[in-house]
Amino acid sequence: MSKRRLTQNQQRRIKSNHHKKIAKPELEWQDEMLGEVQQGIVVTRHAKHADVETEQGEIYRCNLRRTLKNVVVGDQVSWRKGNEQLQGISGVIEAIYPRKNELSRPDYYDGIKVMAANIDQIIIVSAVLPTLSLNIIDRYLVICETAKIPALIVLNKIDLLSESERQEVQKQLAIYENIGYETLCLSADTGENMEKLDRYLSRGTSIFVGQSGVGKSSLINQLLPEVNALTGAVSDISGLGQHTTTSSRLYHLPQGGNLIDSPGIREFGLWHLEPEQITLGYREFQSVLGTCKFRDCKHKSDPGCAVREAVEKGEINAIRFENYHRLIESRDETKSQRHFRTEE
């Protein structure tokens, strides 16, 4: 783990914490009870605490300084170990190093919620049952493009398909391959193509996203059998599984790389984004955006719409274009019904 420099504000915060008396010593640390400042990575985030891994691979449960907000899995942090445990807590996180990126989603109660930080790729996990939803894949891809994090589309439970059904699925995935996205069909149950997933995951730090029931926990069980992540039963009625992961956590993979597992998300909303951001989330639109006749073109029936003309010429996939408008409409409907605030 390479050393990283703290900002001046973070250095002042640490120095201030060193000289500040703690009001409740029975609940928090006094300065003389703490060791030297060291660097670590957050591997698990709990409601009031976080587990920090040291450069030596040791993990300590830590309190958070009151001045810190929104510590998440993947954060590189400055922390201090206590001379002894205090009510089961081993140290204190003092500061968060600047993030290279973060994955966020809107929350109906908390505004914009950061899920994880410092991610090298997002693994979008989908499944053939109850149905393969390209609209949901497109929704996640907009998030990936907005966060500027590379994406890999993984289709799980491929063993449940016949040969003809597999060919049809490959045609659907070709829509994404033709615009530069990588895709992978596999089965966590049979192990088909799991070695290919291993190679993708060895690239760096990855995070699984996808609706409940697509088999994220089953994939983790295959990748890390000793973890034995809980596997939720898929509802016979809805086909959607129950949430089985209760805390976000970072795992080190034996073949190299890290994997962040976060609670399943049934709806990854886009209502925190502006329509222009969703438009920019469609990478194949980029070559024609700005060439429409009207600057405020909505890319519907507007005269001289370059995006629609590209669809009619077959240069932009019609299904993706239809999903784009569905996402915009869904965003507008939800936006009018919900109020949210961004975290300061």
From Swiss-Prot:
It is found in: Cytoplasm. GTP binds at N156, K157, I158, D159, G210, Q211, S212, G213, V214, G215, K216, S217, S218. Binds 1 zinc ion per subunit. The keyword Disulfide bond does not apply. Zn(2+) binds at C292, C297, H299, C305. The keyword Zinc-finger does not apply. Residues 100-268 form the CP-type G domain. Gene3D superfamilies: Nucleic acid-binding proteins, P-loop containing nucleotide triphosphate hydrolases, Probable gtpase engc, domain 3. GO terms for cellular component: cytoplasm. One of its GO terms (molecular function) is rRNA binding. Its EC number is 3.6.1.-. It is an enzyme of class 3 (hydrolase). Its main location: cytoplasm. CDD domains: YjeQ_EngC. Keywords: Cytoplasm, GTP-binding, Hydrolase, Metal-binding, Nucleotide-binding, Ribosome biogenesis, RNA-binding, rRNA-binding, Zinc. Its cofactor is Zn(2+). GO terms for biological process: ribosomal small subunit biogenesis. Belongs to the TRAFAC class YlqF/YawG GTPase family. RsgA subfamily. Monomer. Associates with 30S ribosomal subunit, binds 16S rRNA. NCBIfam families: PRK12288.1, ribosome small subunit-dependent GTPase A. One of several proteins that assist in the late maturation steps of the functional core of the 30S ribosomal subunit. Helps release RbfA from mature subunits. May play a role in the assembly of ribosomal proteins into the subunit. Circularly permuted GTPase that catalyzes slow GTP hydrolysis, GTPase activity is stimulated by the 30S ribosomal subunit. This is Small ribosomal subunit biogenesis GTPase RsgA. The gene is rsgA.
